[in-house]
């Protein structure tokens, strides 16, 4: 993911948590915050230390990033997203993870995602 599409700072994460809307399924919680003046979307990832070891957590983050790269044309611009992975993600394949991520994005009101 490009640098302009990432949320890295703690205060940016906190703003999305406090002011944004959340949607969830068994595998993910997605917080969404509208930012009209922003020309692109931004994504922040969070995988708890309760989920596996570092290898498993990094694998989950890589799969989420790859899914976002494939869906980038369908994700609404002008929004910040924070994606929190839950425990069931540790046993999922890439296809299952991507399908679950699409499901939770659709629940959050993104109409352009068709896959």
Swiss-Prot record:
UniProt KW keywords = Endonuclease, Hydrolase, Nuclease, RNA-binding, tRNA processing
List, alphabetically, the GO terms of the cellular component aspect. Answer: ribonuclease P complex
List, alphabetically, the Pfam families matched. Ribonuclease_P (PF00825)
Molecular function GO labels: 3'-tRNA processing endoribonuclease activity; ribonuclease P activity; tRNA binding
Q: Which reaction does it catalyse?
A: Endonucleolytic cleavage of RNA, removing 5'-extranucleotides from tRNA precursor
InterPro entries, from UniProt?
A: Ribosomal_Su5_D2-typ_SF (IPR020568), Ribsml_uS5_D2-typ_fold_subgr (IPR014721), RNase_P (IPR000100), RNase_P_CS (IPR020539)
Q: What's a single GO BP term from this record?
A: tRNA 5'-leader removal
Q: Which Enzyme Commission numbers does its entry carry?
A: 3.1.26.5
Q: What PANTHER family does its record include? A: RIBONUCLEASE P PROTEIN COMPONENT (PTHR33992:SF1)
Q: Give the protein's function.
A: RNaseP catalyzes the removal of the 5'-leader sequence from pre-tRNA to produce the mature 5'-terminus. It can also cleave other RNA substrates such as 4.5S RNA. The protein component plays an auxiliary but essential role in vivo by binding to the 5'-leader sequence and broadening the substrate specificity of the ribozyme.
**What is stated as this protein's family in its record?**
Belongs to the RnpA family.
- Relate the assembly described in the record: Consists of a catalytic RNA component (M1 or rnpB) and a protein subunit.
Official protein name in the record: Ribonuclease P protein component
Its taxonomic path starts at: Bacteria, Bacillati, Bacillota, Bacilli, Bacillales
